[in-house]
């Protein structure tokens, strides 16, 4: 059972917490992580790319010259794909790139991502995180105290907290998530994984 230190907002160790083996201590499955990240990025694609075919390009309705007798190659339209300003053959059209992956695979990938953060000592547990007012400087000081102010980090909260969310919004390299919006791509993409103690309890409740 992985055991990690619990920090306060001043960066001091105030205790320890035991994390569940079946969530934070599994063997990392890199293939599952890769599959889920590819799926996430594919689902984010707009799919609005488009090209015009020969029939959609303006002009080219008349045969440029007669079929025989000119000595030149035969052509039926100046908008064929081989012509300058011609249509595109087999070009991209608007489409959806979305596809689904099995729920078990998503869960395995998420647990693998969390376990990798524990293995690499990149997971930090905060005792609590609450601000009386919206203040970016307060959040910046917390990151500085935790020694993660010069790297990228994802912050996971148990529930919505407006003051914390807005205080973190303008800090470069910091992304705020909640237990229900936690995802493999953001966990892997950021160097550090910061999570509050009550969020750990919620993660273990949801993914046990």
Swiss-Prot record:
GO terms for biological process: translation. This is Large ribosomal subunit protein uL4. InterPro entries: Ribosomal_uL4, Ribosomal_uL4-like, Ribosomal_uL4_dom_sf. The gene is rplD. The keyword rRNA-binding applies. Disulfide bonds: none annotated. It comes from Acetivibrio thermocellus (strain ATCC 27405 / DSM 1237 / JCM 9322 / NBRC 103400 / NCIMB 10682 / NRRL B-4536 / VPI 7372) (Clostridium thermocellum). Part of the 50S ribosomal subunit. Pfam families: Ribosomal_L4 (PF00573). GO terms for cellular component: ribonucleoprotein complex; ribosome.
């Amino acid at each position: 059972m992985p055991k990690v230190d619990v920090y306060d907002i001043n960066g001091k160790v105030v205790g320890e917490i035991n994390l569940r083996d079946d969530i934070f201590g599994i063997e990392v499955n890199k293939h599952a992580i890769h599959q889920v990240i590819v799926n996430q990025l594919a689902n984010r694609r707009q799919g609005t790319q488009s090209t015009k075919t020969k029939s959609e390009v303006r002009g080219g309705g008349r045969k440029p010259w007669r079929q025989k007798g000119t000595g030149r190659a035969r052509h039926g339209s100046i908008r064929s794909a081989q012509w300058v300003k011609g249509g595109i053959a087999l070009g991209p059209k608007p489409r959806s790139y979305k596809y689904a992956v099995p729920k078990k695979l998503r869960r395995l990938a998420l647990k693998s991502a969390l376990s990798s953060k524990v293995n690499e000592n990149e997971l930090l547990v905060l005792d609590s995180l609450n601000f009386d007012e919206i203040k970016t400087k307060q959040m910046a000081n917390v990151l500085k105290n935790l020694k993660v102010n010069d790297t990228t980090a994802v912050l996971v909260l148990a529930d919505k907290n407006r003051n914390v969310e807005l205080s973190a919004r303008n800090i470069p390299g910091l992304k705020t998530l909640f237990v229900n919006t936690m995802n493999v791509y953001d966990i892997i993409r950021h160097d550090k994984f910061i999570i509050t103690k009550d969020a750990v309890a919620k993660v273990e409740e949801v993914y046990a």
